[in-house]
Amino acid sequence: MHRRSLLVALAVCGLAMSGRAARSAEPAKRISMLIGLPLDHPIVSARVAELYRLLAERGWVEGKNLRVSWRVWGASEVDLARGAAEVVAENPDIIVVGSSAETAAVLAKTRRIPVLFGTASDPVGSGFVRSLERPDGNATGFSNNDPAMSEKWVELLAEIAPATRRIGVVFNPHTTPAAGATYLARLRAAATGDEPAFETIQVTEPAAIDREIAGFAGKGAGGGLVFLPDSFTYRNAALCTAAAARLALPAVYPFDTFTLQGGLMSYAGAREETAEMLASYIDLILRGADVAELPVQFSRSFELVINEKAAAALGLSLPASLRIRAQRILS
């Protein structure tokens, strides 16, 4: 058994004696959530419902033995800092956050309350944990986009759009882990010869998305896009996919949120697996597990999602090799 899996199994066994019956007599546990998209967003509402279902399977029912509060931060770093301060002020049993940006904001406010991140691309390099196997602090969670995946995104882009000669790498340096440096280093190291040529496209406000991508497109033919994991572009997924479509640029995205909103293709850790792991860790921490001893988990399965309508609009045909490997084809 893998060491991380063994550690989790031991944590489960060690806490099982507490039992659900004993838990029901205790005051309701409290979770504070800090996320970047509104709860009425169709993708978010579906995933929230799934998380509640998984928690209920483990004996945690909202309104009975569980109280959950939500904070959605706005468009600026000031809003994010305010949201982080508010969830810390609630002094909950756990703070659950979505991305690296939210994790950093909350950890700047507390090193005491357990913090569980849903996705952090480089938790060690970002200073969230001391090591993956033993975080040794008040934060742990999951990572479904390792920097090594950037090479895979480029491979997929070349496969679906073989005429691509220039790749624009889109990200916000303020909300991407290490300002995108770890991803860019992997991309450049994987390049052979002069092609593809990489160009950074930095976007720091919604209005810049279309403008900066248009600037890249205007430099010549053969352009394509790779979007880095980034809470800013995630929040503005519809603007990102609309710009790529308007400018007829094939693009690969780091989350299926983009393909569900018209993007061409995404490759990332399976969302269902992340939800299952998140519910499992919430359960463990609420039952007394030490967050410092819960290893950071990585996705074990990955999902290739292709939007066939977007491909057709770009004049691209899906090769059989991609059709076979895709877990979902949206048509």
Listing of model-derived features with the role each one plays in the protein:
Residues 1-331:
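Short hydrophobic alpha-helices and adjacent helix-cap/hinge residues
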